[in-house]
UniProtKB/Swiss-Prot annotation:
Species of origin: Novosphingobium aromaticivorans (strain ATCC 700278 / DSM 12444 / CCUG 56034 / CIP 105152 / NBRC 16084 / F199)
GO molecular function, one term: small ribosomal subunit rRNA binding
Protein name: Small ribosomal subunit protein bS20
InterPro entries: Ribosomal_bS20, Ribosomal_bS20_sf
Role noted for this protein: Binds directly to 16S ribosomal RNA.
Highest taxon, organism lineage: Bacteria
Homology family: Belongs to the bacterial ribosomal protein bS20 family.
GO biological process: translation
């Protein structure tokens, strides 16, 4: 158990950050899901628009430290390739 005031503060801060990061990650997943839904429907224009909206969200995840840059690069690459192949 945290005995020092600073350790207690870090626990509070970590809980807040975990909630914020979870919300950010959920938002990113939603944008990616929109692209995948459009791809499953076979609608190229909708998929391209959804991808255009998802890319800045993914990049923001890297900037905020929620996702690793290589993970985002891989996701963007795969989604872009799938949209282009429609």
């Amino acid at each position: 158990m945290a005995n020092t005031p600073q350790a207690r503060k870090r626990i509070r801060r970590n809980e807040r950050r975990a909630e914020i990061n979870g919300n950010r990650l959920s938002r990113i997943r939603t944008f990616v899901k929109k692209v995948e839904t459009a791809l499953a429907g076979g609608d190229k224009t909708a998929a391209a628009e959804a991808l255009k909206a998802a890319q800045p969200e993914l990049a923001r995840g890297v900037a905020r430290g929620v996702l690793h840059k290589n993970t985002v690069a891989r996701k963007m690459s795969r989604l872009t390739k799938r949209v282009a192949s429609l």
